[in-house]
Amino acid sequence: MSTEGKEQFHISSFVVRCLPERLQDIMATVASMPGAEVHGDDARGKFVALLELESDAALVETITAIELIQGVVNTSMVYHHAE
């Protein structure tokens, strides 16, 4: 079934692991991205990111942008829903 030409909506959450000394800066950077929210951080350098975007391409672009932030160690997707 093709979704071409149809509106899509993607909700995704994941854990971002980063260097603890960069945690606050990275959280602020992620929070400033379109469709992104940040939640639940800890002092060891982990926080939850929530993305609500209109295409799978935008989702991949945003996750890639987060992974390329200096000090990010990795991202682990926890949930993804698309309509």
Please provide the spans of the model-predicted regions.
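Amphipathic, hydrophobic secondary-structure cores in small proteins
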Residues: 13-17, 23-82
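Short, flexible, solvent-exposed loop/turn segments with mixed acidic/basic and small polar residues
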Residues: 1-8, 36-41
